[in-house]
Amino acid sequence: MEEIKVSVVIPVYNVEEFLNNTLSDITGQTLKEIEIICVDDGSTDTSCKIIEEWQKRDSRIQLIKQKNQYAGVARNNGLKQAHGKYVVFWDADDLFERNALEVMYTQAEQERSDICICEARKYDNAKEKYIPSDAYLKENLLPEKQTFNKFDVPDYIFNLTNNVPWNKFYFKK
């Protein structure tokens, strides 16, 4: 069995309309040494059936079922099953660049980082396009170098990003 470089944990709750796109996006990542852990949080729609169909096509996909306990518990249960060196928590309606995992993995390995944070864009339904959002990563506060620590930005290290888990790439071991 190949080494699992990244575990992708996805909390799932009644997201049938998004799941096919999200699973297609993740299975199509350029980094192939991944596992995809879908944690169903008591869905009442066809979310589990969609995941089970994907499992037939891709052995990297796992399904964990739990009663409804909300996304935090689902993420924690997925984390308990994760075997990757790194872990990301993506929501079922998230889409990422095809090379997102590979870029973050390579950067984390080169810099021996404990966490990588990526920018995000959100879809503006009225304008029918993606727009930048500094709510997830305040690029104007970042130091010029890509890799930094709390000593580089001591006054606002905790203000650089908000508390969403899906734009972060974590060292697990």
Please state what every model-predicted region is:
Residues 1-173:
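Nucleotide-sugar donor-binding/catalytic module of glycosyltransferases
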